Amino acid sequence: PDERFFQLLAQLACQSIPPHRIILMNTERAYWDAAGAEGRLETIGISERCEIHHLSKAEFDHGGTRNAGVLFSETPYFVMMTQDAVPCDDKLLERLLFPLVNGKAEMSYGRQVASPDADILEKFTRRYNYGDQSFLKTEADKEKLGIKTYFASNVCAAYVRARFDALGGFPPRAIFNEDMIYAARLLQSGGTLAYCADARVYHSHCYTPAQQFHRNFDLAVSQAEHPEIFANLKSEAEGIRMVRRTARFLKRQGEGREIPRLFALSAAKYFGYALGKHYRLLPKWLRARCTMNRSYWEKCA
């Protein structure tokens, strides 16, 4: 837990609809203790609502750990957030839950806004992927939106518990992308997904080309492991479209010097994705070099 995590908890404490319980799935207790987290929860005034479950890094799984967290709850609606997503205002939970409570959707996800200190590439990426207009998505949108139909991030997302349980939750074993896999199953079963542009969190990264390579390798592995969802959906065209729009944006902003870095990051994404799609052809040692989640492959041994 870092300072952003404690900012997140402080913001949750003052929401217009405050959470009844906050279930924290913490990886490695030593980090929790070293950060003095118990004392910080007391200072924020939220400790009585927090329930902490510690696990080792080897035990963590993108799908299984989240499923375990849900099992600790008994609410008809629940919200999932990562530790680095900070609410922009006190209306996040209210706006995220609105389409669920009103029967418009069975899952919703919020808008990710780049942190003020994010670089220009990351700021454009967040604006590109998270627009300022809310909308609903169903399986019928696949012809128009392609793979973007299933795009949904549980960096900040809300779920109808009954539907979540009926669909079996997240895949119990997932290297990455468990949120999109669940969203696809929801839409394929006749459900509706809501994007809530007014439910905003600060969330951004500044990845190096190497980090983007690892991330996209794992993304592609997740898609290759679920051909029932992704076999006939292509990501490459959407990726090329985004690179072109980003390059044009940089030119308009007089930031042409950032274009080489854009191309370096994009190349890393592409090669990571290409290798991940064919991970079954790679020896185990090479998979371990390409992934950002080595413990996942150790469990596969």
Model-based region annotation:
Residues F176-Y182:
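Acidic donor-binding loop at a coil-to-helix junction in glycosyltransferase catalytic cores
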Residues S56-S73:
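Glycine-rich, basic loop-to-helix element that forms the pyrophosphate-binding segment
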Residues P1-C14:
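Short, well-formed alpha-helical segments that are part of the catalytic scaffolds
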Residues F78:
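Short aromatic/hydrophobic "clamp" motif used to bind/position activated sugar donors
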Residues D218, A231-A301:
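Non-catalytic, C-terminal membrane-associated alpha-helical segments of glycosyltransferases
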Residues E139-Y159, I175:
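A recurrent flexible, glycine/aromatic-enriched loop bordering the glycosyltransferase active site
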Residues P19-A30, H53-L55:
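Short beta-strand/loop segment that forms part of the nucleotide-sugar
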Residues D90-K123:
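Conserved donor NDP-sugar-binding/catalytic core segment of glycosyltransferases
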